[in-house]
A protein has these predicted regions:
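Alpha-helical transmembrane segments and their immediate juxtamembrane cytosolic regions
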Residues: 1-330
Length: 330
């Protein structure tokens, strides 16, 4: 990653975020509602969903170069290679078991129309991020760099407040509008990042208060439209602060999280397949009444399988690593 030595904490943060994606998806069991009957399940699920995807887009915006570097063939080719090819590959592969075993999956079909216009079966993040990378360099050149960056940010905020585009599913416009706000915040923050990260010690108490607020209220993010926009920052700041602490000690946790970060796209793309297999097995072994144990087992099996599969199979094969966005290691 460019400027890696300055942003190790962001690598750690992204590693934490992809693990939270795996955990968040572990609450999904076709035909069973394991959230409303268990307070702990609901709390963990909603706390994770309050911020984990905005976090990914915020980091992506932070790491975006200026339009002089982005408005060229090399930039767009890199995004096709990094995002579009894995997106197409995984959705084509995904379509096969969905048609053969449609009773075992949460989403029943993955047609060509859905892949092109509606982000596939479970890959909206990759689809939306790719579209954002396509349009943002143009927005940056013709709007942001014309000293209208505050107006653009205000415009994104108002679009979300009034939920404009929230019902438009084609090209994931609903998610594009929402996630663009966090992408843009990340883009703006990079100019002030060193000053902010350098002042952490001085404001330790404030960060601890934010963590406490996230623990107490993060799961209420979806109560109001304003809380849906503001509350994600509680989780983002809390885990950023934790990442800064982990960064200071290069131990097994550090190494594990950075591995997850550099292969986060593979984790995201392959998690659905692991989920389909283990969901069917576990629901027959563990009674639904023990739903927290069910979630914990589901999460653990998926994470262990993903780590082993990605480390020893995907990363070792140049074709798999290319098609799944992993870091190839001979």
């Amino acid at each position: 990653m460019e400027n890696k030595k300055y942003y190790e904490e962001l690598r750690i943060l992204k590693g934490i975020a992809i693990i939270l994606v795996v955990l968040g998806h572990s609450f999904s069991f076709t035909g069973f509602n394991i959230l409303d009957n268990n307070i702990l399940n609901r709390y963990i699920h909603d706390s994770i969903y309050s911020f984990h995807m905005p976090l990914f887009f915020m980091i992506a915006g932070f790491l975006t170069n200026n339009y002089e570097d982005n408005l060229n063939k090399k930039f767009y080719f890199s995004k096709i290679k990094r995002l579009l090819i894995p997106y197409i590959f995984i959705n084509i592969v995904d379509a096969i078991p969905r048609h053969l075993f449609n009773s075992l999956v949460n989403n029943k079909s993955n047609s060509i129309e859905r892949i092109i216009f509606y982000s596939g079966a479970a890959t909206w993040f990759v689809y939306t991020l790719f579209l954002l990378f396509l349009i943002f360099p143009i927005i940056e050149k013709y709007i942001i760099k014309k000293d209208k960056y505050y107006l653009f940010g205000l415009g994104l905020f108002l679009l979300n407040i009034f939920e404009i585009g929230s019902n438009i599913k084609i090209f994931t416009v609903d998610r594009l509008v929402y996630m663009s706000f966090y992408f843009y915040i990340g883009y703006l923050l990079k100019n002030y990042y060193e000053k902010i990260s350098g002042s952490v010690k001085k404001f330790n108490v404030i960060y601890i208060v934010i963590i406490i607020l996230f623990i107490l209220y993060g799961n209420f993010y979806n109560e109001f439209i304003l809380s849906k926009i503001i509350f994600p920052f509680l989780g983002i700041i809390s885990f950023w602060y934790i990442s800064l602490k982990i960064k200071k000690v290069e131990n097994l946790i550090y190494n594990f999280l950075t591995f997850c970060e550099e292969n986060s796209l593979s984790f995201y793309l392959l998690e659905v397949f692991c989920g389909t297999v283990y969901r069917v097995i576990l629901i027959k072994i563990i009674p639904i009444e023990y739903n927290f144990l069910l979630v914990l087992s589901f999460f653990s099996l998926k994470l262990i399988s993903l780590v082993i599969g990605i480390k020893y199979m995907v990363c070792k094969n140049k074709y798999f690593s290319f098609l799944l966005g992993a870091k190839y290691k001979k």
